[in-house]
Amino acid sequence: MTLTGFRHQPVMLREVLEWLDPKPGGTYVDCTLGGGGHALGVLERIGGRGLLVGIDRDADALAAAAFRLAGYGDGVRLVQADFRELAAVLRRLETGPVQGILYDLGVSSHQLDTASRGFGYQQDAPLDMRMDPGGGVTAADLVNRLPEDELSDLIKAYGEERWSRRIAAFIARERKREPILTTGRLAEVIKEAVPARARRTGPHPARRTFQALRIAVNDELGALKTSLHQAVDLLDAGGRVVVLSYHSLEDRLVKDTFREFAVHCKCPPGLPECRCGVVPRLDILTSRPRVPGEDEIAANPRARSAKLRAARKRADVLKDKGVK
């Protein structure tokens, strides 16, 4: 990889900065640093007295971001980690409460376009899909080892794929002949499994299955839920969390998590007064997700499915806990 050639076009940058609202001298965390496009926008707002913590599992992304953000010196701290380790990372850096946390979920353009990473179905490459190539199961492990019914359930749950049973059956048949070890071969098997009438319109027939495998390999939804819960604890009063998601599973999880922390009462209906003692911790800022404009989609088609949600830590939470 050449650092200057790392492809990164930040999605909805203007909207991210609007809802994150970085303040001079503040501390902000980019949990999915990528090439550093969003981080650069934040750094321009917070100035020399601020701090930007960038987290990413991908060593290539960290190297590219370090190159891009080098001019900000001690105002940038970059860490290779899974964002489910957010609390541990900030504790180690001794940042204290932070004023904003950003997530730009999913796979980056660089990862999709780098054939050797095995995320894409347009090129033939080893069937990998790990965000951190240093360890863990690969997509090939799942495709070749999972029982057919478990593979079908995985594709259905994480890919919302209508033809999951048929795809799993075709995969099980083909792997008996020879292990499926490349993205190209898996894409061909999926294409054969999906009926011709369903292939005539819409995205590539392999898209949903590849999404499902990637989510499973990296435990993306589990990591997101864990990290969002930590983010609520780590935010300062009035601090904001902004999330860009790219498919319905991510967006639903973000929406439900924000609602969980914004609820005023969990008592059963019918009680004359609240007895649960639940205190809302977030104010939801985006009643509906924000989406990219037509001009951005034309310039960057991969932004098409993006949805932005934002929430703010309530100031009265700290007062209720006796924090002055």
Curated annotation (Swiss-Prot):
Q: Which InterPro entries match?
A: RsmH, SAM-dep_MeTrfase_MraW_recog, SAM-dependent_MTases_sf
Which GO terms of the molecular function aspect are on file? rRNA (cytosine-N4-)-methyltransferase activity
Q: Gene Ontology cellular component?
A: cytoplasm
Domain of life, per lineage: Bacteria
Q: Mind listing the GO biological process terms from this record?
A: rRNA base methylation
User: Which keywords fit this entry according to its UniProt record?
Assistant: Cytoplasm, Methyltransferase, rRNA processing, S-adenosyl-L-methionine, Transferase
Query: Which Pfam families does this UniProt record tie to the protein?
Result: Methyltransf_5
Catalytic activity annotated for this protein?
cytidine(1402) in 16S rRNA + S-adenosyl-L-methionine = N(4)-methylcytidine(1402) in 16S rRNA + S-adenosyl-L-homocysteine + H(+)
Primary location class: cytoplasm
Which Enzyme Commission numbers does its entry carry?
2.1.1.199
- Keyword set includes S-adenosyl-L-methionine: yes
Residue sites binding S-adenosyl-L-methionine per the record: G36, G37, H38, D56, F83, D104, Q111
* UniProt subcellular location: Cytoplasm
As for family, the record states: Belongs to the methyltransferase superfamily. RsmH family.
- Name the job this protein performs: Specifically methylates the N4 position of cytidine in position 1402 (C1402) of 16S rRNA.
Q: What is this protein called?
A: Ribosomal RNA small subunit methyltransferase H
What gene is this protein translated from?
Answer: rsmH
